[in-house]
Structures are given as structure tokens and as C-alpha cells.
């Protein structure tokens, strides 16, 4: 299996085979965690730019740690201390980062579609670390890998997602990924947090909405 895309902007367009390829690659790197020396040479000589235009702790540190453990150097853009505060546009900021010749850009932004917009103007791979209410591909992959590790499979499972799903980019990535493996979804939360349009975001994937946790846990 080959990965068709230069970037990782969303899970929705990926096939089950491509998702399995990414999960298997991720699994192969888990062993690093158990090594006394947590370092590989996979990305030696490469530089990963981290541009988080929205507050992040776990995702930013996780990407930085992953890059370091795979041998890459990192450069960090602190949005609150950048020229964005002086009126520089997002695209100009991206061009300036690109001029420093990183090999990859990891980007989080509050606007849905911002990483895709930037990726169309740069000549390096862009990884979406969360954009608005659109998607959070890396978290979706991590969730699927965790489920596969614990359950032994991600196929044909009943999956319940609870909380404020109207704003959850993670829930959308979970649905797009796991739905390709025959999973069925129950979405649960107060009615204002579970918009019915979520039932239609992945055609062919069974999705139902309920508003009581007892109903959500029936299956």
C-alpha cells in the first residue's frame, strides 16, 4: 500500500488500506517508548516546523517529542509572540516559515480549512494538528491505534462518543476513520451539543444520536 497524499490534512479522504498503513507504521514506532535510549535516526537531518496558532499543550508537546525521538530537529512558532500580532497574514507567516527550509510543517489553527489553505501554497508536507471544528487527524489515528491495541481490532465495533460534539473535530475524525472499518456510532450529549447533521457526515456509516447516557450504553 502506498500513501497517495503529500500532506495529512484530514482522514475523510483516506482509504481503509491507507489508514491501516499509517496505523501499522505508528505501531512500529511504539517500541521506542520502551528503549533506554529513546532515539531513532529515521528523520535525522530533517527539520519539522511546529506552528500552533491555537492554544495546545498535549498535541504540541507530542509532535515535538515524536519529531525528536525520530531524530528530527524542530523549530517552534509561538503565535502569540509572532508577527501575526502586528497584522501579518497567515499566508505570509507560512511563506516566512517555508523560507527557513523546514522539511515538514505541523499546523494547528482555529479556522476550519486553514491547514489545507496553507498546504496549497507551500512545497513541503503539511500535517493538520487540528483545525476549527473540521478534523484532528493525528488524534483520530491515535484513538484508533489505542482501540486496536486494547481490543485487537477496529473492525465492526459499536462506538459511543459523548460530550460537546457540535464543536468536536476529534469526533469527526473518529467517525471518518472508524466508519471505514464497519464501526457503528452512537453520539450522546445534550441536544444542543449533538447536532443531527453529524449523522450524515459519513455516508454509509450507521450513526444515531441519543440524549441519555443510559441509551448510549445499551449496545
What are these regions (language model features)?
Residues 18-21, 25-28, 96, 117, ...:
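Alpha-helical scaffold segments in soluble metabolic enzymes
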Residues 53-65, 149-219:
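Glycine-rich phosphate/diphosphate-binding loop of Rossmann-like nucleotide-binding domains
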Residues 28-34, 87, 203-211:
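Short gly/ser/thr-rich secondary-structure transition/capping motifs
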Residues 37-148:
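Phosphate/diphosphate ligand-binding glycine-rich loop within oxidoreductases
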Amino acid at each position: 500500500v502506498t500513501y497517495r497524499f503529500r500532506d495529512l490534512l484530514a482522514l475523510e479522504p483516506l482509504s481503509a488500506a491507507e489508514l491501516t498503513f499509517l496505523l501499522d507504521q505508528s505501531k512500529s514506532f511504539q517500541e521506542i517508548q520502551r528503549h533506554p535510549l529513546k532515539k531513532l535516526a529515521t528523520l535525522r537531518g530533517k527539520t519539522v516546523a511546529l506552528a500552533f496558532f491555537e492554544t495546545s499543550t498535549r498535541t504540541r508537546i507530542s509532535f515535538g517529542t515524536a519529531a525528536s525521538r525520530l531524530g528530527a530537529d524542530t523549530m517552534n512558532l509561538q503565535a502569540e509572540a509572532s508577527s501575526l500580532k502586528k497584522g501579518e497574514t497567515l499566508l505570509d507567516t507560512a511563506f516566512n516559515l517555508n523560507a527557513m527550509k523546514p522539511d515538514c510543517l505541523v499546523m494547528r489553527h482555529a479556522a476550519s480549512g486553514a491547514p489545507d489553505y496553507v498546504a496549497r501554497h507551500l512545497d513541503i508536507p503539511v500535517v493538520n494538528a487540528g483545525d476549527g471544528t473540521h478534523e484532528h487527524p493525528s488524534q483520530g489515528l491515535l484513538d484508533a491505534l489505542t482501540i486496536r491495541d486494547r481490543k485487537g481490532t477496529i473492525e465492526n465495533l459499536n462506538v459511543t462518543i459523548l460530550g460537546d460534539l457540535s464543536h468536536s473535530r476529534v469526533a469527526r475524525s473518529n467517525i471518518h476513520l472508524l466508519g471505514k472499518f464497519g464501526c457503528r456510532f452512537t453520539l450522546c450529549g445534550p441536544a444542543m451539543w449533538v447536532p443531527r447533521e453529524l449523522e450524515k457526515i459519513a455516508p454509509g456509516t450507521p450513526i444515531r444520536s441519543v440524549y441519555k447516557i443510559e441509551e448510549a450504553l445499551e449496545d
